[in-house]
Curated annotation (Swiss-Prot):
A motif (PAL) lies at residues 466-468. This is Signal peptide peptidase-like 2A. GO terms for molecular function: aspartic endopeptidase activity, intramembrane cleaving; protein homodimerization activity. Residues 1-25 form the signal peptide. It is found in: Late endosome membrane; Lysosome membrane; Membrane. Intramembrane-cleaving aspartic protease (I-CLiP) that cleaves type II membrane signal peptides in the hydrophobic plane of the membrane. Functions in FASLG, ITM2B and TNF processing. Catalyzes the intramembrane cleavage of the anchored fragment of shed TNF-alpha (TNF), which promotes the release of the intracellular domain (ICD) for signaling to the nucleus. Also responsible for the intramembrane cleavage of Fas antigen ligand FASLG, which promotes the release of the intracellular FasL domain (FasL ICD). It comes from Mus musculus (Mouse).
């Protein structure tokens, strides 16, 4: 049984509605030392918005500032500034009760060089509307309460700080890893879908078997109307998630754990069934069950549970999330069937519009000027929980000083794998039915080219990109050109039929084509 058999449509749509991941906060180093004692120093991680302020890239170029502890005052009024003043100092305040921008304006008016907000959350506050903070020039950064307490205990009260943001190499190896994962997943998922198609064609021996198989497959088939309804549900779900994030994020985590553990089981059990060893069985409820599958189910559940418990552990939890995510994408590509190219165009086209709208258009609608997709990626309302709908690959610490910060990661949304993967899976099934491999190979290459274009734009624009904006045109245009050049567009558009073939004799299919739509009508 596939994933769609086990999850209700709203739950599946909720998981689908957030399949795009974007980057969030900028990390920097706060180098603290005791005045007059250069040997006594310590580095801490701080978070800032590089759209507001630029920091030097090295400690040598950073400016020394005397640190002033103002956590005992709210700094919400000019009267909160101490008599000695705060000119050319870095002041530390607690979060609240007034808005952090109000604190920044007061600190700036008092001549402070930087405002450090000691907060339990390490998330930098969202930038809001640009007109709100355009007159604020003082550096605003966030440090954790734990780090500030350690700073006072280690270095005392007379502290000097330097702030800088080490630059990363121009070449980001994590993009290569993500590229390999994405192309491998869509290629394997599409090929697996073709293998299932081939097995179905070989197993059909009479009309009764054919009718039984068609009824089973129709449960997983997305008609054009179903595709439209599904995308509408996705839009509704992402809006609900935006307004009720603090509650629904845990629903998403629960759905991901259940769906990904089942997907991992489906992927690994397919390998176990083909292994000559491990065939021992036990009788349970009148059925013979392989002992190896019992252990496998326990392993898959354990992986999901361990990830759920340690999901916020930056050092290694990403490995489990990526394993579960790859299995989830593979299972979904293999399970969901688009019956024809028309359904593929509708699904990919609507999700492309969906992607662009929630990334580029919603900033003109929301009150804070941020896109809904960016807010969900960062966690609205400074929520530390993240949606588990991305492939994450951390950057190796090329600079040891950056080890004090959480590991920076590159991400790719599951939707950027699954959505084009469904098209590639259809191309592979069509190839199996027509005795070729041209559609599968060309669509996979087109996906790889689209990913490369996405990464090039990412490096040029220096900001997160909706990958479907480049993947959808690359894949759809490529397979359309192939279909037109082979004079198979009509057949490719409507979908090829299943035929009862001896030794894969495809000439019957050419002489008596029956479209998938006609199959549905006949039922």
């Amino acid at each position: 049984m596939g994933l769609l058999h086990s999850l209700h449509a709203p739950a599946a749509a909720l998981l689908w509605s957030c399949l795009l991941g974007l980057a969030a906060a900028q990390e920097a180093i706060l180098h603290a030392s005791t005045n007059g004692v250069s040997s006594l120093s310590k580095d801490y991680c701080m978070y800032y918005n590089n759209n507001w302020t630029r920091l030097p890239s090295s400690l040598e170029n950073a400016t020394s500032l005397s640190l002033m502890n103002l956590t005992g005052t709210a700094l919400c009024h000019l009267s909160d500034i101490p008599p000695d003043g705060i000119r050319n100092k870095a002041v530390v305040v607690h979060w609240g009760p007034c808005h952090f921008l109000e604190k920044a304006r007061i600190a700036q008016e008092g001549g402070a060089a930087a405002l450090l907000i000691a907060n339990n959350s390490v998330l930098i506050p969202s930038s809001r509307n640009k007109s709100t903070f355009q007159n604020v020039t003082v550096l605003i950064a966030v440090i954790t309460q734990k780090d500030f307490k350690d700073m006072k205990e280690t270095l005392g009260d007379d502290i000097t700080v330097k702030m800088y943001s080490p630059s990363w190499p121009n070449f980001d190896y994590t993009l290569v890893v993500i590229f390999v994962i994405a192309v491998f997943t869509v290629a394997l998922g599409g090929y697996w879908s073709g293998l299932i198609e081939l097995e179905n064609m070989k197993s059909v021996e009479d009309a009764e078997d054919r009718e039984t198989r068609k009824k089973k497959d129709d449960y997983l088939t997305f008609s054009p109307l179903t595709v439209v309804v599904f995308v509408v549900i996705c839009c509704i779900m992402i809006v609900l998630l935006y307004f009720f994030y603090r509650w629904l994020v845990y629903v998403m985590i629960a759905i991901f754990c259940i769906a990904s553990s089942m997907s991992l089981y489906n992927c690994l059990s397919a390998l176990i069934h083909r292994m000559p060893c491990g065939q021992c069985t036990i009788l349970c409820c009148g059925k013979n069950i392989k002992v190896s599958l019992i252990f496998l189910s326990g392993l898959c559940i354990s992986v999901a549970v361990v990830w759920a418990v340690f999901r916020n552990e930056d050092r290694w939890a990403w490995i489990l999330q990526d394993i579960l995510g790859i299995a989830f994408c593979l299972n979904l590509i293999k399970t969901m069937k688009l019956p024809n190219f028309m359904s593929c165009v509708i699904l990919l086209g609507l999700l492309l519009i969906y992607d662009v709208f929630f990334v580029f258009i919603t900033p003109f609608i929301t009150k804070n000027g941020e896109s809904i997709m960016v807010e969900l990626a960062a966690g609205p309302f400074e929520n530390a929980e993240k949606l588990p709908v991305v492939i994450r690959v951390p950057k190796l610490m090329g600079y040891s000083v950056m080890s004090v910060c959480s590991v920076p990661v590159s991400v790719l949304g599951f939707g950027d794998i699954i959505v084009p993967g469904l098209l590639i899976a259809y191309c592979r099934r069509f190839d199996v039915q027509t005795g070729s491999s041209i559609y599968y190979i060309s669509s996979t290459i087109a996906y790889a080219v689209g990913m490369i274009i996405t990464f090039v734009v990412l490096m040029v624009m220096k900001t997160g990109q909706p990958a479907l904006l480049y993947l959808v045109p690359c894949t759809l245009i490529t397979v359309s050109v192939v279909a037109w050049s082979r004079k198979e567009m009509k057949k490719f558009w409507k979908g090829s039929s299943y035929q009862v073939m001896d030794h894969l004799d495809y000439s019957t299919n050419e002489e008596n084509p029956v479209t998938t739509d006609e199959q549905i009508v006949q039922q």
